């Protein structure tokens, strides 16, 4: 080849390298963000990062889900909606891919869930998504968008197979059944499966809490299949709480250990001196404790980092938006999906069961759920479509949730505190926050989830003895009692926010209910409700749309 052509080829090569340099630099700069998205499948089970393409997704197995011409025109949450914020879903003004789209959708066994942020996008540059500790974890390790902002057993199993159990989620500190287990890279694959079985099978994180020195009870006996628990540190296997819909939060953590009292606060339980700090303050403290504990950080989060995490969480809303059978959950003036939650009224003590509404003074209204009032018009006939039949079932389920009589008995925190053997109620007696489903004030209850009679062989069992009376109780988790030291608080836990519940099986604080039908069966058996097969199906249909 002549020297003249060599010079030309060299010149072209240099020009190509100069043109490629910005692309290479941008790709390198986004490596950390890409790692998160790859780990979690871009938080979109369809692999579709452009929300404008979501109308073509295979989220629903029912071919009629999008066939109703009225469905998309009635809602801001429509699957065909071109949210203005979505134009920035894959890049910021500098073109770096540090965002996920607003109205981020992910599939579950019942349909499709959507996440909406008041920021206009899911910001992957937030400290929530950053590894700040020493073990590679971030908040998002246990609070994954595609898993209802928590983790599911199925999701954990998929991650285990993908990484052979070496992902930062699988760390001895709280992922292993015994925190003294070797680091996963020192174990065989099958040994990892055994060591992390509670995380794999139930999506449970191990929480270690000791019995307070001044507690009214002591540990009389412990049966721990993993050989670790003692009075100094009980092993408590619990589901991570979702990190969305915090607008409606009244209690932080299952046992309320991050909910603090503040005598100067105006958020007080009526008739008591129990006043509580702003939830935002408690969440900031919780974010720091989680970083020091779960992420094994060597130093506290800065105040700026804590605020950024809390601001992100507080602006995040998540709810089911599409049902496999009923179609779009905003159709025909229904109020499903996350955006309606922004306008939903909430304050401390709203619609309180025991004393009525704290602000208006109105009596407790058991019709807590009203999302699908407009679907009461559906009366199935032989000519009804499958979607109409499904929507009628959802509406019936909502009515059952609001009004089906339940004779509430043996619930610590309710029957004993009120000194009534039988309290006539409904599901909404305990799930009283309008269209959210948690309790609007701190009110931990013991409905029997951690009773010894429900213990499975994979759970530790603790025998607690009252120091004064000698009475003994067996439980798999003392719950609130490990925070207060009070005998009466054994087995008490908060009721969770119910929105986006279809995205996050298994259920209850210990993951003991595999699916929504199992949840309904528990309550039906526990309180002898007498639900028919059709009523059970209707309740499940409703819960799946929340």
Describe the predicted segments one by one:
Residues 4, 40-98:
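Asparagine/serine/threonine-enriched low-complexity, disordered tracts
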Residues 1-8:
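N-terminal secretory signal peptides that target proteins for export/translocation
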């Amino acid at each position: 080849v002549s020297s003249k052509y060599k010079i030309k080829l060299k010149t072209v090569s240099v020009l190509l390298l100069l043109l490629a340099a910005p692309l290479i630099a941008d790709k390198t700069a986004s490596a950390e963000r890409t790692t998160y998205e790859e780990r979690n499948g871009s938080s979109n089970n369809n692999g579709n990062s452009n929300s404008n393409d979501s109308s073509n997704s295979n989220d629903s197995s029912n071919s009629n889900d999008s066939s109703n011409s009225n469905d998309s025109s009635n809602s801001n949450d429509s699957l065909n909606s071109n949210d203005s914020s979505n134009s920035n879903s894959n890049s910021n003004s500098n073109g770096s891919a540090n965002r996920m789209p607003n109205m981020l959708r992910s599939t579950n066994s019942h349909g499709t869930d959507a996440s909406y942020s008041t920021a206009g996008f899911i910001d992957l540059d937030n400290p929530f998504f950053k590894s700040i500790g020493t073990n590679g974890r971030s908040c998002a390790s246990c609070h994954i968008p595609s898993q209802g902002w928590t983790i599911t057993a199925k999701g954990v199993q998929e991650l285990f197979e993908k990484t052979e159990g070496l992902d930062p989620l699988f760390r001895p500190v709280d992922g292993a059944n015994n925190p003294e287990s070797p680091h996963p890279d020192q174990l065989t694959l099958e040994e990892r499966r055994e060591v992390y079985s509670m995380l794999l099978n139930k999506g449970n994180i191990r929480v270690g809490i000791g019995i307070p020195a001044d507690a009214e009870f002591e540990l009389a006996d412990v049966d721990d299949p993993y050989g670790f628990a003692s009075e100094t540190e009980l092993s408590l296997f619990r589901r991570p709480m979702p990190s969305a819909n915090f607008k409606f939060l009244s209690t932080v953590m299952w046992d309320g250990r991050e909910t603090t009292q503040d005598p100067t606060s105006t958020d007080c339980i009526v008739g008591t001196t129990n006043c509580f700090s702003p939830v935002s303050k408690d969440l900031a403290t919780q974010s720091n404790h989680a970083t020091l504990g779960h992420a094994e950080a060597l130093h506290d989060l800065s105040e700026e980092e804590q605020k950024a995490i809390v601001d992100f969480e507080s602006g995040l809303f998540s709810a089911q938006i599409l049902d496999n059978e009923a179609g779009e959950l905003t159709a025909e003036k229904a109020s499903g999906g996350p955006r309606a939650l922004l306008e939903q009224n909430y304050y401390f003590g709203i619609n309180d069961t025991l004393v009525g509404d704290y602000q208006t003074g109105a009596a407790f209204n058991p019709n807590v759920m009203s999302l699908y009032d407009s679907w009461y018009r559906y009366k199935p006939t032989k000519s009804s479509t499958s979607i109409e039949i499904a929507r009628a079932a959802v509406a019936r389920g909502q009515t059952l949730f609001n009004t089906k009589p339940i004779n509430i008995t043996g619930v610590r925190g309710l029957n004993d505190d009120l000194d009534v053997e039988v309290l006539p109620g409904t599901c909404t007696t305990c799930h009283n926050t309008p269209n959210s489903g948690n309790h609007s004030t701190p009110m931990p209850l013991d409905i029997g989830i951690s009773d010894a009679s429900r213990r499975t062989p994979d759970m530790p069992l603790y025998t607690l003895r009252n120091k004064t009376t000698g009475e003994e109780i067996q439980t798999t988790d003392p719950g609130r009692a490990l925070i207060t030291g009070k005998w009466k608080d054994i087995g008490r836990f908060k009721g969770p926010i119910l929105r986006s519940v279809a995205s996050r099986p298994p259920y209850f604080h210990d993951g003991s209910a595999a699916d929504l039908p199992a949840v309904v069966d528990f309550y039906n058996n526990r309180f002898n409700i007498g639900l028919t097969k059709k009523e059970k199906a209707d309740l499940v249909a409703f819960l799946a749309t929340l």
